[in-house]
Amino acid sequence: MNQKFLDIYTDSIKNPENFWKKISENIFWYKKPTKILNSDNPPFYKWFQDGTTNTCYNAVDLHVKNGNGEKIAIIYDSPITNSQKKITYAELKDQV
């Protein structure tokens, strides 16, 4: 494994709350969480408990909004039917 990956992995294990706080800054939130990890009731941990986001918006719509609508989002490649289809982010947004 490369060293950068190992450093990131080690950080995520040693300091998970800070690690996921940094990661969470890279996604869109309707309401940003004020607390990253609620560990009051182990082993039932709650992450980003008071935050509100939308996974579909982050995975699809945001790419279109940022000017990447014509980039390929999904490649369907079937060896059974010997067919391939490519779907852009814009097409995917219209379909979901």
Predicted regions and their residues:
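Short His/Asp/Glu-rich catalytic/ion-coordination signatures at enzyme active sites or charged loops
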Residues: 1
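Short, charged, surface-exposed hinge/linker loops at domain edges
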Residues: 4, 24-53
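Short amphipathic alpha-helical segments
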Residues: 5, 70-72, 80
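Adenylate-forming
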Residues: 6-11
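Intrinsically disordered, low-complexity regions enriched in Ser/Pro/Gly/Gln/His and often acidic
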Residues: 12-13, 40
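A short N-terminal helical cap/helix-turn-helix that marks the beginning
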Residues: 13-31, 51-75
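Conserved AMP-binding/adenylate-forming core of the ANL superfamily
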Residues: 56, 74-96
